[in-house]
């Protein structure tokens, strides 16, 4: 299982890697094919199938502890993939286990199996969720490009990995991916090593930093082959430029702050310079992987490794120009790491507060020195400066690492080592490019800028760095000592500071790109020193800072201008100063002035500008907010004298006023008068409301009637209610004939044909009476009801008169429904009794209630028909009249009865049981009144039919 877990984790990490790869879409599909195959197979088994399909584990050679593998006591018979265990508490289909087949032993009574404490789906998704980034192209990439995944090791994987590292946020996976990329780059030369790396990357992704360390070292091994990589560098650089991840740096770490925005636009990756840039960006990527954790910005920065540096983290560096500075720093760090610790580094690191950074920086410094020596463009002083910047960077990195997981540290270290080797190669390439670049326009290539700048900067830096690094060592402000020095140290420092938490844009801005960027750094420093006159540089720096701040806020904008783009990199100390913003920034300026007094004005001024910009880049929003607050306080103090009243007093005053006003209002409150006020409109409103409440069922009708009649008069309301109920009854009758339900009810009722006959006669009478009433009521409420009432009279009359037809439609229907209803009547009976036939029936709001449930109504009708029940309903409803249980009484009084009462006896019914009736209307009426149009009519029909049947 451990193996499977490893493969799982490996595949998972590789999958995420794959996703990043597929996202970044390296151009080379798969360069390391052999590796691709071996790895592909593993991955295919572990990750690919897994990522995508829920195919049974047994089918996959995967050893992942899939919940449905036999291993977890599961019978084959249930099918591997079936959620076999976990049958639930009452295990239906008892998979096995005793008890309730709830299972003992591994089958815990707790429904989950021993291992399957999680359902396979859940378990899978659990194991899978990290792994299965199906949303991320990775899983797809995995399954789609198994080979590609190995080819991931190839260029695609390298750029993808770069992008992976860039989205260091994807951290370990991406880290491993990046390392895989580097290893795959190397792996083109040495696929075996790459394979190990890939495997290790998997394991490492799981193991975290440890694996990354391994990967780093492995990657470092191939890194020396970076020449091959360098050759592919251009494409890689373009890839890295292309790779979305790289472009969208994981804003993972403040390091991104190192955003010396390179002037050269992202396009700068010219094929030739591009390889160095791509190397730089790769280093940046590696560094991103290593230091990218520190600053996701670096990732973005390398992304644009050839492009501008990404703005500081504060400004969304995510898409800032590649953190070439970061990449540079990282590469230098890695180089330094590859080299042993350097005395300079040590010194600087000692000065640096972070201890972790110290060792790394020493290593990086040495590596940088070696690189610089290899480059030859830079003197030892430059090397010192560069390595020192790395040292600060590593210091800053390390604090950041401290915040980050050990994996990141390990990855970073490995990457630094890797990058150190790679950067050495890169530096060699860069030196070549430098010599070219110095001659070539700065815009043509960043390395060219760097060469030019470095040519000048090397001298300046050598001088200033050699002399001033000590001063920088002396003070962290001194770390800013040389602009060039500071540019690079600032890359480190800004990372440091950002890691330290300053995360200031300026720090990030000052950060430079990788070795190319290092050159750029030198170039920028030189530019700032030599190209721009100090004043111009200051202004430019400020402009840049402003623009960088803007860009920082926005996505990275490359300063295409060639102005010195040195953004203030804040040393952690500066950071400390700058965080307090004003004071620290000023202190920083002072320190810088003192430290850089030897420096050229340009550098100093750029630093000064950067200090200012550091303040501004502290975060424009921060500064702005501070500024606003200051203004507000100033204005308040000077222009708005305080009344001397405390907030408590002030609000108490308001509260008192409010209470007094409220009391006054309450005394005079017209609302009360309105309540008391008795006006037709009020009654209309109240009456309608009450009516609706009372008989929402009828309200459809009653409300209409009320509106149509004079809703103002309560008496009218009462009459209207009666009329509406009558109408409802009439409607019910007419609708009974019309309604299939009603007809079915009629049939139910017609089960007792005697009742039918009675009903017919009664209904004729009812209808005639109802007609008169409904006509009167319709005259009162002519609108909807009048036609209905008239309709009813006519239809009812026809039905009543043609009792056979009427009864047939109703009663025939009733006959049919009768049996059904009677079948339902058992229910209906229960219902009615349960429902309280008394209420429901008397009002036929019972029916109405049932009408809300027509089935119930039908049943209730049956019950009502049932002489047994009807008498009861009589008793309940017509407490007096209806107590006569005889059908005769029903016939005679049935009209007065609840159903018919709506017709004629309605008034009597109301009188006899007015409160119950109204209560019904209120209760059941609410449900049913609206239904009353149909169901209400049905109810009335039911009532009528019930009454006749009762009769």
UniProtKB/Swiss-Prot annotation:
Residues 1-13, 82-94, 157-166, 305-322, 337-346, 548-558, 776-786, 844-854 have a biased composition (Low complexity). Residues 204-220 have a biased composition (Polar residues). It comes from Xenopus laevis. Residues 266-276 have a biased composition (Pro residues). Residues 1-94, 117-558, 661-951 are annotated as: Disordered. This is Thyroid hormone receptor-associated protein 3. Associated with the large multiprotein complex TRAP (Mediator complex-like). GO terms for molecular function: ATP binding; DNA binding; transcription coregulator activity. Residues 14-51, 121-143, 759-772 have a biased composition (Basic residues). The keyword Nucleus applies. Involved in pre-mRNA splicing. Involved in nuclear mRNA decay. Initially thought to play a role in transcriptional coactivation through its association with the TRAP complex; however, it is not regarded as a stable Mediator complex subunit. May play a role in the positive regulation of the circadian clock. It is found in: Nucleus. Residues 58-75, 144-155, 167-188, 347-387, 411-449, 460-483, 490-518, 537-547, 661-677, 688-758, 877-891 have a biased composition (Basic and acidic residues). Its main location: nucleus.
């Amino acid at each position: 299982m451990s193996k499977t877990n490893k493969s799982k984790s490996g595949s998972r990490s590789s999958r995420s890697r794959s996703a990043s790869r597929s996202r970044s879409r390296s151009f080379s599909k798969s360069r390391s094919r052999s590796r691709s195959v071996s790895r592909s197979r593993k991955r295919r088994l572990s990750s690919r199938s897994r990522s995508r399909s829920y195919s049974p584990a047994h089918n996959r050679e995967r050893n992942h502890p899939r919940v449905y593998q036999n291993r977890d006591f599961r019978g084959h018979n249930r099918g591997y993939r079936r959620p076999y265990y976990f049958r639930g508490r009452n295990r239906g289909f008892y998979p096995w286990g005793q008890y309730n087949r709830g299972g003992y032993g591994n089958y815990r009574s707790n429904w989950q199996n021993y291992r399957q404490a999680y359902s396979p789906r859940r378990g899978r998704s659990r194991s899978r969720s990290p792994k299965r980034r199906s949303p991320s192209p990775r899983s797809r990439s995995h399954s789609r490009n198994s080979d590609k995944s190995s080819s991931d090791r190839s260029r695609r994987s390298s750029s993808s990995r770069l992008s992976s590292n860039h989205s260091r946020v994807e951290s370990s996976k991406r880290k491993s991916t990046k390392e895989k990329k580097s290893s795959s780059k190397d792996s083109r030369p040495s696929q075996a090593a790459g394979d190990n790396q890939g495997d290790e990357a998997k394991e490492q992704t799981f193991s975290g930093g440890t694996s990354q360390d391994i990967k780093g070292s492995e990657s470092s091994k191939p890194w020396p082959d970076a020449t091959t990589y360098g050759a592919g560098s251009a494409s890689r650089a373009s890839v890295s430029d292309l790779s979305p991840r790289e472009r969208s740096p994981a804003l993972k770490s403040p390091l991104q702050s190192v955003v010396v925005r390179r002037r050269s636009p992202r396009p700068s990756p010219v094929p030739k310079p591009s390889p160095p840039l791509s190397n730089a960006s790769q280093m940046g990527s590696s560094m991103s992987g290593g230091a990218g954790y520190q600053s996701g910005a670096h990732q973005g920065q390398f992304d644009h490794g050839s492009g501008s540096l990404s703005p500081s983290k504060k400004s969304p560096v995510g898409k800032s120009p590649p953190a070439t500075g970061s990449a540079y720093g990282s590469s230098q760090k890695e180089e330094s790491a590859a080299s042993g610790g350097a005395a300079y580094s040590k010194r600087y690191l000692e000065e640096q507060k972070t201890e972790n950074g110290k060792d790394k920086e020493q290593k990086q410094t040495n590596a940088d020195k070696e690189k610089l020596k290899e480059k030859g463009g830079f003197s030892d002083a430059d090397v010192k400066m560069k390595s020192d910047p790395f040292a600060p960077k590593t210091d800053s990195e390390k604090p950041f690492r401290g915040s980050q997981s050990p994996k990141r540290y390990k990855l970073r270290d490995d990457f630094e080592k890797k990058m150190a080797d790679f950067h050495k190669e890169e530096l060699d390439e860069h030196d070549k490019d430098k010599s070219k670049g110095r001659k070539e326009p700065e815009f043509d290539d960043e390395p060219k800028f760097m060469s030019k700048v470095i040519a000048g900067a090397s001298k300046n830096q050598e001088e200033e760095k050699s002399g001033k690094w000590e001063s920088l060592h002396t003070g962290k402000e001194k770390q800013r000592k040389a602009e060039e020095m500071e540019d690079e140290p600032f890359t480190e420092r800004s990372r440091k500071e950002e890691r330290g938490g300053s995360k200031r844009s300026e720090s990030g801005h000052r950060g430079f790109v990788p070795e190319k960027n290092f050159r750029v750094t030198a170039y920028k420093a030189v530019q700032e020193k030599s190209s721009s006159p100090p004043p111009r540089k200051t202004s430019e720096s400020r402009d840049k800072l402003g623009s960088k701040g803007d860009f920082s806020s926005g996505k990275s904008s490359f300063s295409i201008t060639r102005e010195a783009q040195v953004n203030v990199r804040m040393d952690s100390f500066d950071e400390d100063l700058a965080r307090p913003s004003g004071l620290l920034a000023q202190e920083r300026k002072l320190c810088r002035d003192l430290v850089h007094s030897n420096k050229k004005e340009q550098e100093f001024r750029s630093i000064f500008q950067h200090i200012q910009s550091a303040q501004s880049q502290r975060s424009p929003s921060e500064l702005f907010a501070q500024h606003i607050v200051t203004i507000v306080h100033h204005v308040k103090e000077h222009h708005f004298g305080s009344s001397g009243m405390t907030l408590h007093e002030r609000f108490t005053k308001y509260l008192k006023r409010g209470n007094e006003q409220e009391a006054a209002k309450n005394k005079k409150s017209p609302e009360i008068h309105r309540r008391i006020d008795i006006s037709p409109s009020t009654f209309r409103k109240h009456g309608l409301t009450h009516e609706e409440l009372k008989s929402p069922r009828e309200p459809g009708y009653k409300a209409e009637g009320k509106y149509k009649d004079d809703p103002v008069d309560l008496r009218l309301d009462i009459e209207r209610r009666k009329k509406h109920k009558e109408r409802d009854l009439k409607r019910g009758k007419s609708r009974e004939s019309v309604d299939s339900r009603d007809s079915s009810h009629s049939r139910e009722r017609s089960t007792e044909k005697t009742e039918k006959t009675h009903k017919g006669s009664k209904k004729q009478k009812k209808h005639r009476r109802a007609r008169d009433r409904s006509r009167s009521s319709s005259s009162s409420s002519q609108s909807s009801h009048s036609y209905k009432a008239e309709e009813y009279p006519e239809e009812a009359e026809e039905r009543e008169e043609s009792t056979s037809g009427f009864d047939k439609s109703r009663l025939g229907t009733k006959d049919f429904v009768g049996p059904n209803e009677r079948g339902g009547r058992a229910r209906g009976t229960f219902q009615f009794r349960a429902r309280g036939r008394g209420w429901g029936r008397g009002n036929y709001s019972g029916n109405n209630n049932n009408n809300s449930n027509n089935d119930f109504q039908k049943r209730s009708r049956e019950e009502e028909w049932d002489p047994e029940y009807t008498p009861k309903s009589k008793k309940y409803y017509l407490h007096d009249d209806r107590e006569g249980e005889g059908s005769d009484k029903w016939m005679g009084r049935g009209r007065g009865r609840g159903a018919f009462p709506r017709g004629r006896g309605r008034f009597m019914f109301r009188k006899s049981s007015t409160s119950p009736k109204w209560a019904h209307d209120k209760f059941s009426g609410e449900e049913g009144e609206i239904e009353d149009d149909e169901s209400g009519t049905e109810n009335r029909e039911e009532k009528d039919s019930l009454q006749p049947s009762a009769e």
